Amino acid sequence: MDNRFYFGFNTSEERKKRRKAELYSMSEQVSTFFWDEAPQHGLEMREGQQDMSFEIVDALINDQHFAIEAGVGIGKSFGYLVPVLLYSKRMNKPVIIATSTIALQEQLWRDVHAVMPLLGLNRDVILAKGQTHYLCNKRADEYMCDPKADPPDALKEGIQQGYEERKDFPEVLPQGVWDKVNVQRFSMKNCGSCEKKCKYYKVRASLKYTDGVVLCNQDFLTQHLMKLRRGQEGLINAAADLLVVDEAHNLDDKVRSATTERFGQGMLFGMIKSAFYELRSFDQSSVSGEKREAESAIIAFYNCLKAQVQKQINEAEQDMRYADRFFFDNNGSAIELLTEMNAAIHNLSSSIQIYSSMDFRNNRSFAASDDLDAVSESLSELLDRIDDMLIWIEQHGSNTELVYCPKNTKEIVSRLYFNGDERTILTSATLTNATSGSLEEQYSYFISNTGFPAGDRGCLSEPKPSPYPYDEHAMIYYCDDLPHPTREHEAFIEKGVERLLEILSISNGKALVLFTAKTDMEEVYSILSEKNLPYKILMQQPGSSQDKVLNEFKEDTNSVLLGTGAYWEGISIEGKSLSNVIIFRLPFPVPDPIIEYKCSVAKDALMDVRVPEMIIKLKQGIGRLIRNFTDTGIVCIIDRRLRDEPPERYHDITWDSLPIKNRTSSLGELRKFYEGLPSAKE
């Protein structure tokens, strides 16, 4: 539907009628594809997939946003790609598909190119990864020419071969080296001199004019929408009025991340050092006093933060050992010290700006001093709106960070994704937190986090269950006799490892063990490594290539892989290498400022926040086991809190939410079931 589509339809009402007629015609095309054409192409008929496509078209006809939980195996990517690609063609407009992982982006690239020929389409497709995935030629040249640098051969050879993305370079290239040569601070204005040789520049430029399919991450789409809502030019062609958010259970976290500011002590000292270097041709002694004052104020403020962190660690319950975020106490001297630090940074920045204005004829860059000025502006805004902000502290080794974001993430998500001219399709395998009640009740936690407009403006779909035969192919084992994992943590680790070894003996390895805390994972790995077990024990390594560890796990069929974080949802391993998923501890959220704020505004903190968070992550973890129609195996939950007697308040809602209904608390029954599986006999 290009400009010719509107010829003769001058009023808004006429255009709406013409658009709806086009969508009705598209609905017929979708039906024809699934009922007549897909079988001719040898595509497997999946009821949930077809229903999903038809419901998306209905939502578009009714001018509604649309949310759907689509179980593993229904083919949700094809389910939304068919109507979305046809929409792009018929309306001659770009469509944007955003995910939360690079793995799904790359899979969608393959899926789009598989679906288009089936529909007789040939749309432009742009894969827009985050900027740090791309080589910056300018930074690479500077690094290669730096006499103090020692560029590894993998980098030299890759550049000579013309590699432009991180995935092109060998895995042995250290991430620390890549961070010295990748794109870090892109802008169309400042990077214009590189437009002919920078792949990322070409990608960003093409996004402005495409009328095809844009595949990006949720962070990038959020930044695009934030610009549009501020009345600025977006990052993508503004004609795009259909958005798809896959892995939508992460959307509120991604939007929160996009609105989060963080300032570390090391970062601020680095800015001051760089700003002073920019004054190398001037008399630096004239601003050395302001520099000392700023550095002293920074040290005083961050020492206060470190003291707060240590106090919380000393006084906290066992759960605090898992914390990544610590609470910021704004009732003491911290606000006064923050105000003094901000004033000192502002004074230093103002003094440096005077020199930069004197040097305008030389057209030299004073980027670091501009950065200091931006820090001061951000901190001033924080102090002005402190009651509207969530503030916390993060500790990374010796570096301490002040981190903050607006409290009203729900309102921000709603304004960005549901209050513009665009219509948004949201999907995930884990959007619901209950299986009974009204659709609003089943999707209640998702709605509370995103402000999805259920009703006239938004359609909630009946969840589409996975077609996989879970109860024939899988069984869940749960414990009822172990120590409490938080109140009796040391005893839990000891007894939990003993139970883990019993479970591993049933499957002879072949297991993915999921942890909620890195410290638990490392402790269990240390214990298992000393046991001289008949299978290799692997562990997710910080900074290592995920592909390398996963490939080793796949190739060594009986190996055991310990993981946390992204391993709960970011991996897909088919076959008998993964025949046993072990949940070492129920994934309740760790108490932190974000969770505590959600709890503070909930009627029932446990049932309205902590349990839904746990259920969604537990469903993600269990979903690692059955990835196709032939996969079989067991899931083992080493946590007594799902025992039948005495039941916890969340006992029934948790069990009802899980796709595998076949369960036992007997290791003997578990062994008998596993030994009867085809994979155990191979």
Predicted regions, residues:
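A substrate-engagement module of RecA-like helicase motors
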Residues: D2-E44, M91-V214, Q218-T222, S281-G289, ...
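Conserved RecA-like P-loop NTPase helicase motor core
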Residues: C479-E490, Q541-R643
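Conserved interdomain hinge at the start of the Helicase C-terminal
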Residues: L482-T516
